[in-house]
Design a protein with these regions (language model features):
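N-terminal, polar/charged subdomain of small-to-medium soluble alpha/beta proteins
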Residues: 1-88, 92, 104-150
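An anionic oxygen-ligand recognition environment, strongly enriched in 2H phosphoesterase
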Residues: 95
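Residue- and microsegment-level detector for short, conserved "hotspots"
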Residues: 98
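Phosphate/pyrophosphate-binding loop motifs in nucleotide- or prenyl diphosphate-using proteins
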Residues: 101
Length: 150
């Protein structure tokens, strides 16, 4: 499971011209699943995201977590995080998980993330063509991979 976290002042997802979800201060999480992902990956990743200290404290030091600042989370499915570009110039997405496997993983991730932060998590729509708009704060962007635990 791969995730790209972006600390945002605001973010939103628009589908077919209609805003589906939006958040103010918090995290935009782009989430990519593969067939080998498990609930163990979800548990590790959601706990790490909830406790990662990437928000500024009073001294301007990144020393607070999403839990500390009470921020929101917007999760967007992103199969392109599994792009392989070893051969040619057109990315291959063979490592991206199948729809049958990744939809339940994505839904489980959202549920567990809600439990970790104690409030609803906003989402995009799995498999939809989306317009994601964000104001990156910092900018702070973190890439995570559950297989490497980094």
């Amino acid at each position: 499971m791969r995730a790209v976290l972006q600390r945002v002042s605001r973010a939103s997802v628009t589908i077919d011209g209609t805003v589906k979800s939006k958040i103010d201060e918090g995290l935009l999480v782009l989430l990519g699943c593969e067939n080998a992902d498990t609930m163990e990956d979800i548990t590790w990743l959601t706990h790490k995201i909830a406790n990662l200290r990437i928000f500024n404290d009073e001294a301007g030091v990144m020393n607070k977590s999403i839990l500390d600042v009470g921020g929101d989370i917007l999760v967007v499915s992103q199969f392109t995080l599994w792009a392989s570009y070893k051969k040619g110039n057109r990315p291959s997405y063979l490592r991206a998980g199948s729809h049958e496997v990744t939809v339940p993983l994505y839904e489980a991730f959202v549920r567990e993330m809600e439990q970790e932060i104690g409030k609803p998590v906003m989402t995009g729509e799995f498999g939809a063509e989306m317009k994601v708009e964000l104001l990156n704060d910092g900018p702070v962007t973190i890439c995570m991979d559950t297989k490497n635990k980094e």
